């Protein structure tokens, strides 16, 4: 044993006097490293940052730092101010972490003070090098592979379910691997066998690293996936012209590869490659590629990668590259280029076959030899990176047929043109029909070819197509430009659409000529100004490009030189806000909406009106078109919408109806008039959007008005939030469904040329963000169709005695109407009660006593199952109902705070003709099956289970898809189906499997009415159980950096975390929230907290909980929507309780991590402390023996127990005494499996704290070396008798050695004496056991073995081996089967579930009593040795 070297007095002193600092975790940071996860460790105390002294700094301390910072695993722990000396205080002299703590505050450490006052300096400042939070594993290098993040314990793969390119970009940038080239599923790399990370990352693409990206927890703790996400990065991140070049547009080519600059070899270097670099650097085009060493420095590292550019790429790393197999490169043969700067030069479009002199770069005079003169372009797509594919051959441009056309083919086209990744491969002449020859047909590219004409095909010019089958592509480098402002068209924040995302433009430096180019491109006049005094813009977005310097010859922003495009080209305060000269604005006021009212124009800072002389429908058409308000319905005069104020800008306006702006129509001239404000003109427009072709104004094909005609909107990327905005704008309630072109006749007109990207909180469709479709035509299979609920609210009103009793009224298209009782049932009534938060329905009384005669009656018939959350979620028959008398209107009496279970029935109801279901007539249930979702964390996500004939069973996932999931979500009133999961995603169920091969259309009322194999027929097992995730899945949390029971209140709804509004939020509501979160019974609303940063949904307002509510979901509230209030009204709650942490670490933990030793001379000796109810506490030494110590040592992985220490020998602990009268058998795997008094119940003081000393040592503490400053000077009086301590330790070591030698001698002697009599001696063993049992019954024999007192080691042979039962334990009682052989049952009551009673040894059993060293055969010798943690040994 090597215990001696671990027991230096200095190390023991430090361990004993290490002070635990309570309160919140110390704030940490790493400084002066190359990234966030390495550097000098600094601690913030009293508002000031200071360092940690590197004395005794270990990998375990570094591991805790990395875990606290979310930086993965510790891979280095340099001291000696490796990252430079810090400034300011030295706050910590040492830390003593075990390595499993979640924060440094959980470790023992020195008092926090400035140790510079004690003579210490920054020369030993501690540092850390962490692995980082994310890595790419399993690929061909650090820049490609499976995405894995570090939990603080292990690397865990990330699901590919909702993994985005924006997230991949963050990962590649963080790893120094350039930009993301592709995001793949599990097929490229070997799938990890570990679990999948339980969160989805929602990066926007601008974050500095993955750790700070927003995250969303996966329902049930497991993300839906088909494998782990895979990312391939480019590795190349920057390019420059450097060294001896005379300017930034001339010099040697160098690339930043994984953080290092390297020169590029001239092998295969061509003018086409050089042209790409000049374009990328904003240096015009390449003039020449000079050879020779005059541009080269000998110290450069040479990169032998060979690029194969066509010359049209935007970035060098967009070109095909051969990274392997290149020859060695001399310094005289590195690539260089001289760019034109601001000259314009056209580069021939050639393929990548270049004639090059051996051993030298292409010279300035040698033009590239083009072995293939074909050229490629995209036309009619609105830009060079989207459109119909055309190839030039033999002087003629021709097209490609769409037979077999797919993304692999499109990838080749996009790569060849330098347009990034392929987003879409279009067919059917999506960008219009071409003309001329059709060059290719039946193309079958692998996606890796350098040119599209090198892919397999029918042959050049061979086809069976017409131009209506012309192929097209949309690439990621497609660009667009806009200004963003709430109320202006020609002034606002300048944004570009790039790489699939809108982002801002930087203003530094932006001269007048650049602003003029932008204004002309946007049709906003010929000049403008840059506004640098506008307030900082809210929210986050990319800043795509900086240093734009347009020239007089440029006609668009895309032609202007600039810095390279990247995600963060500047800071948010440098985003450009531009005013163009033509910045007049127009609005309609006092008309009740944006699209009707008095016409007003803003000019030179003043709003003025238009005189109504000659004002007619043609003038109104121009106004409606200009505002995006559809067609003109009326042109009002004589101040129909009230009189305005300010100037009268126009009079005698005489538009033709075709003008783009009303001030461009003929008139008397600006400010020329003979009117007053009694003659102010107005308009009434139809509005921007309508639903057409349905059965009313609230369902149908989505159409928007272009100013000329109604145009349908594409269903390609149409979303539910967009539908919600449309329904709300039209006064049609909420969106029930979004469909394709099936239910309604497709319009003959063109499709709207933009995609709407509504968040759901916009007041109207016009104000939603939009993205232009490439080529002006959106990809679609038809027009988008929306069905709105029409019904927006429900109430119980009139003669009812409370809000939970009365006549049922519904708000239909903005008007309240009573509901006829036709088909009114208790199931329908129960949904109304639930929706209003009024409990369940008690009865549905009929008769006029709850009715007023003036009500309008709705004859809609609802067919609820009773489980829906909203009445309008039920199937409804709106047409064909009979007339309804006022005496037959629906009514209900709800329980209020009563609880009553409603039978789950289908929608077939027996009802008397002409009357509502009476209170006495219970519904007739033709089908008593029930449906539920389990193990998903809420009622709207989980494994699908059906109750039939008293048994809950599951559905097999064969053919399980979103149509099936839609039926389930609708049936449960859980909104839209977001995901249909298979493979027991929410865990395997039990019981029968009721359905298999389900094939729903999505419109069935109940899932068991869908076509299937038949009830109970299947060929599945429960590992194929189906599940769903619905949009109404809810969760609740508080968000705070350092508190568990205080923070910003957030709900998870519709797939996103969002905040809760605080107005009005009374004490009872706060109490319900605190109880639901396990944070006590009361709390307070904090209104003085600062405004929260960032943007998020604000899902719900006006929450008013009642005394009977047990969760937030039961409380009445305002309607749930995206923006229910302003950011300053978000709720911040502080609860009085403190939710106890279930684990001492941040992550899930095992029993081993809930047990520790403190105050000892090594990590395997000390006072026993256990974690319970959120805090560490001690164990009382009553009944504490070597058996209990053995369990502790084994649980901690510290070998065998050497001593069971009592009487607080390692110092008294503090806090609770969690356990008393612990009684173990010695074989338990965990202390929790032993019998004990109930948690926290003891009659002890800390002077009786139990401890252990184990044989093993898990860590090695550094010994003190000469010349190292000791801590005894600053910490006096730790040990007054060091000699006594050494004597005790030496004695213990000696006794342990004596015990081991004695045991080995006994075993060896017995084996030699008995080796020839194995059978006879085995019989003798059992006789001896019987004799021992007889002896134990007496309890008075002096020969009996007893527990050895702490100080008694006189008789080594009688020291009980761990696990030996106490003599006080009888053996006559029959031991229950669940306690035999140490098998544990679940912990119940006050016991830690294992009895110290030993089972009777039976035939074939290995009893613990055999470990007492009695005679036995060789098999028992093996057991004896194993009990001491030693491998069986054969002695000769």
Swiss-Prot record:
Its main location: secreted. This is Antigen WC1.1. Residues 1384-1393 have a biased composition (Polar residues). Transmembrane segments: none annotated. Residues 1-25 form the signal peptide. It comes from Bos taurus. InterPro entries: SRCR, SRCR-like_dom_sf. The keyword Zinc does not apply. Keywords: Disulfide bond, Glycoprotein, Repeat, Secreted, Signal. It comes from the Eukaryota. Glycans are attached at residues 162, 244, 256, 351, 424, 444, 499, 531, 717, 799, 897, 979, 999, 1054, 1086, 1173, 1214, 1393. Disulfide bonds join 66-130, 97-107, 172-233, 203-213, 265-329, 278-339, 309-319, 401-465, 414-475, 445-455, 506-570, 519-580, 550-560, 611-675, 624-685, 655-665, 727-788, 758-768, 820-884, 833-894, 864-874, 956-1020, 969-1030, 1000-1010, 1061-1125, 1074-1135, 1105-1115, 1180-1244, 1193-1254, 1224-1234. Residues 1337-1410 are annotated as: Disordered. One of its GO terms (cellular component) is external side of plasma membrane. Expressed on subsets of CD4-CD8- gamma delta T lymphocytes. Residues 1348-1358 have a biased composition (Acidic residues). Residues 28-131, 134-234, 239-340, 376-476, 481-581, 586-686, 689-789, 794-895, 931-1031, 1036-1136, 1155-1255 form the SRCR domain. Coiled coil: none annotated. It is found in: Secreted.
């Amino acid at each position: 044993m090597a215990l001696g070297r671990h027991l230096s007095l200095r190390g023991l002193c430090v361990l004993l006097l290490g002070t635990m600092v309570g309160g919140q975790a110390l704030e940490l940071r790493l400084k002066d490293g190359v990234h966030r996860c390495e550097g000098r460790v600094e601690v913030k105390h009293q508002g000031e940052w200071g360092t940690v002294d590197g004395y005794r700094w270990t990998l375990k301390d570094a591991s805790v730092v990395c875990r606290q910072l979310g930086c993965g695993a510790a891979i280095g722990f340099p001291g000696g101010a490796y990252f430079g000396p810090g400034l300011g205080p030295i706050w910590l002299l040492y830390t003593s972490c075990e390595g499993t703590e979640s924060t440094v505050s959980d470790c023992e450490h020195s008092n926090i003070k400035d140790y510079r006052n004690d003579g210490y300096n920054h020369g030993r400042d501690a540092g850390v090098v962490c692995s980082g939070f994310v890595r790419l594993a399993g690929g061909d290098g650090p820049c490609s592979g499976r995405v894995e993040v570090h939990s603080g314990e292990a690397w865990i793969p990330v699901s590919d379910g909702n993994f985005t390119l924006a997230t991949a970009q963050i990962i590649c940038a963080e790893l120094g691997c350039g930009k993301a080239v592709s995001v793949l599923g599990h097929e490229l790399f070997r799938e990890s066998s570990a679990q999948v990370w339980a969160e989805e990352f929602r990066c926007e693409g601008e974050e500095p690293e993955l750790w700070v990206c927003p995250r969303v927890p996966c329902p049930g703790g497991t993300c839906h996936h088909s494998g782990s996400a895979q990312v391939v990065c480019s590795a190349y991140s920057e390019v420059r012209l450097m060294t001896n070049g005379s300017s930034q547009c001339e010099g040697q080519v160098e690339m930043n590869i994984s953080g290092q600059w390297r020169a590029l070899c001239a092998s295969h270097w061509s003018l086409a490659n050089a042209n790409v670099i000049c374009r990328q650097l904003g240096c015009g085009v390449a003039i020449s590629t000079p050879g020779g060493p005059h541009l080269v420095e000998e110290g450069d590292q040479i990169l032998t990668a060979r690029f194969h550019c066509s010359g049209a790429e935007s970035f060098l790393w967009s070109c095909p590259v051969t990274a392997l197999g290149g020859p060695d490169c001399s310094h005289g043969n590195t690539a260089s280029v001289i760019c034109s700067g601001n000259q314009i030069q056209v580069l021939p479009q050639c393929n990548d076959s270049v004639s090059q002199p051996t051993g030298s770069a292409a010279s300035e005079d040698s033009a590239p030899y083009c072995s293939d003169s074909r050229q490629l372009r995209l036309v009619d797509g609105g830009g060079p990176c989207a459109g119909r594919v055309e190839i030039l051959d033999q002087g003629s441009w021709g097209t490609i047929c769409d037979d077999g056309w797919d993304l692999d083919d499109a990838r080749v086209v996009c790569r060849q043109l330098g347009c990034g990744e392929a987003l879409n491969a279009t067919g059917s002449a999506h960008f219009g029909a071409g003309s001329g020859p059709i060059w290719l047909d039946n193309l079958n590219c692998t996606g890796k070819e350098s040119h599209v004409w090198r892919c397999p095909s029918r042959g050049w010019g061979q086809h069976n197509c017409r131009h209506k089958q012309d192929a097209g592509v949309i690439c990621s480098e497609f660009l667009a430009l806009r200004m963003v402002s709430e109320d202006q068209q020609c002034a606002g924040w300048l944004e570009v659409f790039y790489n699939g995302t809108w982002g801002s433009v930087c203003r530094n430096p932006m001269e007048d000529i650049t602003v003029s180019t932008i204004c002309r491109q946007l049709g906003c006049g010929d000049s403008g100004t840059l506004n640098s005094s506008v307030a900082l813009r809210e929210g986050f977005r990319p800043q795509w490009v900086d240093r734009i310097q347009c020239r007089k010859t440029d006609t668009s922003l895309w032609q202007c030189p600039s810095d390279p495009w990247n995600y963060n080209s500047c800071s948010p305060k440098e985003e450009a806000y531009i005013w163009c000269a033509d910045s007049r604005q127009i609005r309609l006021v006092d008309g009740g909406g944006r699209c009707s009212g008095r016409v007003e124009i803003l000019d030179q800072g003043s709003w003025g009106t238009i005189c109504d002389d000659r004002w007619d429908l043609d003038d109104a058409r121009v106004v409606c078109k200009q505002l995006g308000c559809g067609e003109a319905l009326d042109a009002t005069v004589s101040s129909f919408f009230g009189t305005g104020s300010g100037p009268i800008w126009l009079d005698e306006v005489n538009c033709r109806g075709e003008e783009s702006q009303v001030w461009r129509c003929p008139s008397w001239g600006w400010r020329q008039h003979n009117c007053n404000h009694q003659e102010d003109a107005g308009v009434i427009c139809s509005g921007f959007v309508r639903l057409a072709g349905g059965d009313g104004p609230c369902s149908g094909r989505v159409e928007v008005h272009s100013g000329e005609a109604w145009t349908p909107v594409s269903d390609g990327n149409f979303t539910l939030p967009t539908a919600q905005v449309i329904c709300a704008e039209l006064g049609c309630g909420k969106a029930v469904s979004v469909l394709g072109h099936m239910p309604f006749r497709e319009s003959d007109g063109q499709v709207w040329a933009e995609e709407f990207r509504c968040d759901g909180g916009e007041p109207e469709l016009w104000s939603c963000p939009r993205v232009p479709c490439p080529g002006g035509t959106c990809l679609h299979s038809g027009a988008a169709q929306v069905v709105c609920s029409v019904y927006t609210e429900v109430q119980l009103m009139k003669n009812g005695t409370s809000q939970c009793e009365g006549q049922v009224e519904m708000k239909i298209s903005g008007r309240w109407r009573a509901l006829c009782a036709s088909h009114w049932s208790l199931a329908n009534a129960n949904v109304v009660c639930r929706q209003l938060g009024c409990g369940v329905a008690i009865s549905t009384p009929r008769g006029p006593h709850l009715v007023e005669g003036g009500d309008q009656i709705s004859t809609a018939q609802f067919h609820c199952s009773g489980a829906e959350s909203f009445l309008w979620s039920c199937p409804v028959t709106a047409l064909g109902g009979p007339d309804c008398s006022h005496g037959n209107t629906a009514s209900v009496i709800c329980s209020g705070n009563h609880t009553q279970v409603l039978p789950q029935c289908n929608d077939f109801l027996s009802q008397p003709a002409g009357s509502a279901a009476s209170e006495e007539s219970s519904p007739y249930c033709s089908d008593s099956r029930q449906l539920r979702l389990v193990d998903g964390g809420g009622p709207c996500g989980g494994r699908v289970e059906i109750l039939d004939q008293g048994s809950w069973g599951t559905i097999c996932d064969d053919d399980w898809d979103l149509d099936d999931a839609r039926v389930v979500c609708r049936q449960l009133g859980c909104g839209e189906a977001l995901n249909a999961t298979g493979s027991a995603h929410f865990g395997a169920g039990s019981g029968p499997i009721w359905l298999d091969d389900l094939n729903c259309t999505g419109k069935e009322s109940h899932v068991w009415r869908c076509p299937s194999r038949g009830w109970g027929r299947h060929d599945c097992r429960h590992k194929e159980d189906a599940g769903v995730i619905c949009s109404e899945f809810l969760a609740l949390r508080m968000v705070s950096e350092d508190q568990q029971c205080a923070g910003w209140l957030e709900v998870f709804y519709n797939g996103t975390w969002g905040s809760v509004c605080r107005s009005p939020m009374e004490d009872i509501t706060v109490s319900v929230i605190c109880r639901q979160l396990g944070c006590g019974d009361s709390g307070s609303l904090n209104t003085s907290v600062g405004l929260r940063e960032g943007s998020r949904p604000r899902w719900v307002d006006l929450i008013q909980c009642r005394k009977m509510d047990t969760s937030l979901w039961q409380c009445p509230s305002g309607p749930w929507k995206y923006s229910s209030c302003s950011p300053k009204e978000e709720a911040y709650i502080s609860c009085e309780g403190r939710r106890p942490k279930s684990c001492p670490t941040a992550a899930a933990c095992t029993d081993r991590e809930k047990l520790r030793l403190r105050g000892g001379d090594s990590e395997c000796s000390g006072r026993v402390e256990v974690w319970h109810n959120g805090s560490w506490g001690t164990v009382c030494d009553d009944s504490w023996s070597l058996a209990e110590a053995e369990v502790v040592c084994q649980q901690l992985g510290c070998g065998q127990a050497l001593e069971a220490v009592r009487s607080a020998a390692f110092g008294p602990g503090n806090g609770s005494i969690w356990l008393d009268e612990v009684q173990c058998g010695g074989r338990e795997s965990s202390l929790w499996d032993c019998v004990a008094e109930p948690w926290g119940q003891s009659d002890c003081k800390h002077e009786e704290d139990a401890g252990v000393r184990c044989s093993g040592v898990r860590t090695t503490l550094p010994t003190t070396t000469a010349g190292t400053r000791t801590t005894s000077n600053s910490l006096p009086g730790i040990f007054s008798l060091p000699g006594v301590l050494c004597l005790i330790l030496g004695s213990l070591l000696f006794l342990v050695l004596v015990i081991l030698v004695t045991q080995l001698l006994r075993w060896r002697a017995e084996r030699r004496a008995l080796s020839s009599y194995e059978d006879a001696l085995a019989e003798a063993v059992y006789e001896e056991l019987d004799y021992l049992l007889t002896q134990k019954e007496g309890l008075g024999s002096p020969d009996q073995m007893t527990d050895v007192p702490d100080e008694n080691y006189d008789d080594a042979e009688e020291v009980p081996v761990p696990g030996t039962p106490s003599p006080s334990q009888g053996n006559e009682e029959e031991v229950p089967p669940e306690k035999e052989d140490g098998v544990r049952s679940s912990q119940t009551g006050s016991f830690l579930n294992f009895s110290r009673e030993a089972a009777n040894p039976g035939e074939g059993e290995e009893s613990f009593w055999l470990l007492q060293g009695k005679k036995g055969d060789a098999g028992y010798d093996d057991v004896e040795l194993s009990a001491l943690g030693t491998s069986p040994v054969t002695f000769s």
